């Protein structure tokens, strides 16, 4: 049954014991509800991803269709079987109106609910989360999430679009993403006593590794191999970040279709890939206050990762997670030890936990609404043993991490997928 009746009985029991309620009592009831609720499995029925890059020959509709057609073919469903959709896009210049209409009209969806979402760089993952929750609730049986961005035509280059209003802080137009993240790298080095040379070599190793992985991926934007010298001798963007430490501006789209295991099996699917956790944490302003945050880490990532591991039942992420997008705030590397793990090859394609095996944000660029789903697409291929030349053994769990905004105020998303039953 999809009716969570045990929770009702548990709440009734607690209410008879508590004559007066305070915040701690309500938390007790909330926790009891969560522990009593049955967990409904959600699986990836199909996924699709467009070619990423400078897609001057294609508009956003073309990119959406490219990803959608691959996803529906992979899932083995027709558009009339999709009961609800979530549309992730962040740059308003490419669409008329803030609604789900562009997705519904482009894909000719059959008058179903389409929800447009935007949540910084976690926009695609937010769309995916909405689709998963819809199926988990029992509201629909098959749901779609699609993210798209056409950045090259808008002229967007990573700077905040803060000039449109008159109530914004005046410093915002001068704050760039490379500048703010460079400050975090500097704070990290100072806190952990990291030599600048080691920091630069670790970042160069990541860039070289990402380009090598992308050379095997026909859908990546940048597929050229580079050397450590190329990275270290490249122009500086914001100390210590150089040209090859920053991702490109790209166009792209990615799509996921989710359902229940029972429906997936009825459609002939085997070796199902389940959605283990979807967690998002959003800054509340505490990082900007004079507290314990020192600018060397992402508080939201630590919180989202902790929740995701708990939801997925992962107790030892360093040994249980098979693939990921790396960040030591994910608790894979111990605090301050991430650089050593990178230089030791821990995150290489042949390492213990391969990272950015598709080329990552570095080589796909960052079409904002599409990136989260594009990351999941690689996990989906890897877990299904369909990544071709990039295949990394026989993974069990895959983790993706989106972070949008700035170190002091951001949205952090951690999603875990894995073999059903693992």
Q: Which positions does each model-derived feature cover?
A:
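Beta-strand segments within the central parallel beta-sheet cores of soluble alpha/beta enzyme folds
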Residues: 79-88, 113-119, 143-148, 200-208, ...
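Short acidic, glycine/serine/threonine-rich loops at helix termini
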Residues: 56-58, 97-98, 154-160, 215-218, ...
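Extreme N-terminal basic, low-complexity initiation segments
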Residues: 2-8
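Active-site-proximal alpha-helical scaffold in enzymes
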Residues: 119-149, 178-216, 256-262, 364-387
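Conserved active-site "lid/cap" helical segment
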Residues: 17-122, 188-198, 202, 221-227, ...
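Conserved catalytic cysteine-centered active-site region
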Residues: 37-40, 89-146, 150-180, 222-248, ...
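Acyl-CoA/ACP chain-elongation machinery
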Residues: 147-148, 153-155, 159, 207, ...
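Condensing-enzyme catalytic core mediating Claisen C-C bond formation in acyl metabolism
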Residues: 11-61, 167, 171, 191, ...
């Amino acid at each position: 049954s999809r009716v969570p009746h045990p929770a009702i009985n548990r709440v009734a029991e607690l209410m008879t014991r508590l004559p007066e309620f305070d915040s701690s009592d309500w938390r007790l009831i909330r926790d009891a509800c969560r522990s009593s609720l049955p967990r409904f499995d959600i699986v990836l029925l199909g996924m699709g991803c467009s070619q990423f890059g400078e897609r001057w020959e294609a508009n956003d509709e073309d990119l959406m269709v490219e990803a959608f057609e691959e996803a529906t073919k992979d899932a083995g469903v027709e558009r009339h079987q999709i009961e609800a959709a979530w549309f992730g896009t962040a740059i308003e210049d490419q669409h008329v109106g803030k609604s789900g209409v562009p997705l519904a009209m482009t894909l000719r969806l059959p008058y179903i609910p389409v929800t447009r979402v935007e949540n910084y760089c976690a926009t695609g993952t937010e769309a995916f989360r909405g689709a998963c929750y819809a199926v988990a609730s029992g509201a629909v049986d098959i749901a779609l999430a699609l993210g798209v961005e056409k950045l090259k035509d808008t002229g967007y280059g990573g700077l905040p679009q803060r000039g449109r209003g008159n109530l914004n802080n005046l410093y915002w137009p001068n704050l760039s993403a490379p500048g703010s993240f460079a400050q975090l790298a500097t704070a990290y080095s100072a806190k952990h006593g990291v030599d600048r040379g080691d920091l630069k070599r670790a970042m160069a190793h990541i860039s070289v590794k990402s380009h090598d992985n992308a050379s095997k991926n026909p859908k990546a934007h940048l597929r050229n191999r580079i050397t450590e010298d190329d990275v270290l001798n490249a122009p500086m963007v914001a100390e210590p970040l150089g040209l090859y430490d920053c991702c490109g501006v790209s166009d792209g789209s990615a799509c996921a279709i989710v359902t229940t295991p029972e429906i997936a099996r009825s459609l002939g699917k085997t070796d199902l890939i389940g959605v283990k956790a979807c967690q998002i944490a959003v800054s509340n302003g505490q990082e900007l206050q004079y507290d314990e945050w020192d600018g060397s880490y992402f508080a939201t990532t630590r919180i989202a990762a902790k929740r995701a591991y708990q939801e997925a039942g992962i107790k030892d992420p360093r040994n249980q997670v098979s693939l990921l997008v790396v960040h030591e705030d994910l608790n894979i590397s111990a605090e301050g030890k991430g650089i050593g793990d990178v230089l030791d090859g821990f995150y290489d394609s042949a390492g213990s936990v391969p990272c950015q095996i598709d080329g990552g944000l570095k080589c796909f660029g960052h079409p904002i609404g599409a990136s989260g789903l594009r990351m999941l697409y690689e996990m989906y291929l890897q877990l299904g043993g369909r990544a071709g030349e990039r295949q990394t053994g026989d993974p069990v769990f895959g983790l993706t991490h989106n972070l949008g905004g700035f170190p002091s105020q951001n949205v952090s998303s951690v999603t875990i997928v894995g073999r059903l039953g693992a």
